[in-house]
């Protein structure tokens, strides 16, 4: 009998072991779809981004008009741009839901997979930030100025670091050029990190909603989950296309329709919606260095999740107290997102400060406490 090239060819067998014959727990729910959805998002962003880069000019005098030219004069340029801009939003929706799933079902106990995932999140945030600067509108320019300026809070080397990042004494042409270079490079770094993420995942196999070992009961990925993922793609791509075609500027800032002007500061500088929770935490601390540290901690705290797990059960499926706390955390993040979009005045300042305090308290203190309490209640 001739060997099956799918199982013997050096390249095909890697694809086979990852996407076709991969042993998968039979009971994983739709919450396990987001990994493949993120892969689709990445592919879409790289393709649309490449097409946009062909028509973009990384120069302060031409960047804004080159984007306008793409939308007006390039065949389907408007569609490519709208898909790319809104695709970023869907990328973040998927990654936040993916992280939420991992947190709820204790997937962070696969430490290597979790840590590479957090690094992926940080890289994605960096990519989105430098990408937002490229159209060179008002919010692009001032967003770049404000966020890069935060590095000046680092003692001793801060100011030097900022000027080195800017390539001068303010955000200008060198800044735009290097941001374009970074925005082109980082998605490929994300693709590489994704392969590492998957390598670690396939070492241990997928988790499942019960959090129990399912080695005795696995089924092949194809056709069962390839079909299920296909449904997920359709469910995600439908709202993406709807948004890109019917209301492409819904999530954008109107300020970005004005070309960048260093002499006029917008009344309210704020990032895209997916960074608002972190921006709210940054603003809630009246000290610059303290704010920067809180901003960094708001994301880096994810690295601590495996060490803060005190429960004897892996998932929250059968832990009602932890479930309540989890949904309080979700609500808290939504409040932070809303506060981040509001002006810095009463009552938003105090709401932001309370929500920031609650965020760290839930993650660092309440989750471990509740986990230990549930162990006690169950006589573990």
From Swiss-Prot:
InterPro entries linked to this entry: Cyt_b/b6_C (IPR005798), Cyt_b/b6_C_sf (IPR036150), Cyt_b/b6_N (IPR005797), Cytb/b6-like_sf (IPR027387), Cytochrome_b (IPR030689), Cytochrome_b_C_euk/bac (IPR048260), Cytochrome_b_N_euk/bac (IPR048259), Di-haem_cyt_TM (IPR016174)
Molecular-function annotations in GO: metal ion binding; ubiquinol-cytochrome-c reductase activity
Record-linked CDD domains: cytochrome_b_C, Cytochrome_b_N
A Pfam family reported for this protein in Swiss-Prot or TrEMBL: Cytochrom_B_C
Protein location: Mitochondrion inner membrane
Membrane topology of this protein: Multi-pass membrane protein
Swiss-Prot/TrEMBL keywords: Electron transport, Heme, Iron, Membrane, Metal-binding, Mitochondrion, Mitochondrion inner membrane, Respiratory chain, Transmembrane, Transmembrane helix, Transport, Ubiquinone
Cofactor(s) listed in the protein's UniProt record: heme b
A GO-annotated cellular component: respiratory chain complex III
Lineage top rank: taxon: Eukaryota
Binding site for a ubiquinone: 202
Leftover remarks: Heme 1 (or BL or b562) is low-potential and absorbs at about 562 nm, and heme 2 (or BH or b566) is high-potential and absorbs at about 566 nm.
Family: Belongs to the cytochrome b family.
Protein name, as recorded: Cytochrome b
Source organism (scientific name): Apus apus
């Amino acid at each position: 009998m001739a060997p099956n090239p799918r199982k013997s060819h050096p390249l095909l067998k890697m694809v086979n072991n990852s996407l076709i014959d991969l042993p998968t727990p039979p009971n994983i729910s739709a919450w396990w779809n987001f990994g493949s959805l993120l892969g689709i998002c990445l592919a879409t962003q790289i393709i649309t981004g490449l097409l946009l880069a062909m028509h973009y000019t990384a120069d302060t005098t031409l960047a804004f008009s080159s984007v306008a030219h793409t939308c007006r004069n390039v065949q389907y340029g408007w569609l490519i741009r709208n898909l790319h801009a809104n695709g970023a939003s869907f990328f973040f929706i998927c990654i936040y839901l993916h992280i939420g799933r991992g947190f709820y079902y204790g997937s962070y106990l696969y430490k290597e997979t979790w840590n590479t995932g957090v690094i992926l999140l940080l890289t994605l945030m960096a990519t989105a930030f430098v990408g937002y600067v490229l159209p060179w509108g008002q919010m692009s320019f001032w967003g770049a100025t404000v966020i890069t300026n935060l590095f000046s809070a680092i003692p001793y080397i801060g100011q030097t670091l900022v000027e080195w990042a800017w390539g001068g004494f303010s955000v200008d042409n060198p800044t735009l050029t290097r941001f374009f270079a970074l925005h082109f490079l980082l998605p490929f770094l994300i693709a590489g990190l994704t392969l590492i993420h998957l390598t670690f995942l396939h070492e241990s196999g997928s988790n499942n909603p019960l959090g129990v070992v399912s080695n005795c009961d696995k089924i092949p990925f194809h056709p069962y989950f390839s079909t299920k993922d296909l449904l997920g793609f359709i469910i995600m791509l439908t709202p993406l296309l709807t948004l890109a075609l019917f209301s492409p500027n819904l999530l954008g800032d109107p300020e970005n329709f004005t070309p960048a002007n260093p002499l006029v500061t917008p009344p309210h500088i704020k990032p895209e919606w997916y960074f608002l929770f972190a921006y709210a935490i940054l603003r809630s601390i009246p000290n610059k260095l303290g704010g920067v540290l809180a901003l960094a901690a708001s994301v880096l705290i994810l690295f601590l999740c495996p060490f803060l797990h005190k429960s004897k059960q892996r998932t929250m499926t059968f832990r009602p107290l932890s479930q309540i706390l989890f949904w309080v955390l979700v609500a808290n993040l939504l409040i932070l997102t809303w506060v981040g979009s509001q002006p810095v005045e009463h009552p938003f300042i105090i709401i932001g400060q309370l929500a920031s305090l609650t965020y760290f308290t839930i993650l660092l203190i309440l989750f471990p406490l509740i986990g230990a309490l549930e162990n006690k209640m169950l006589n573990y």
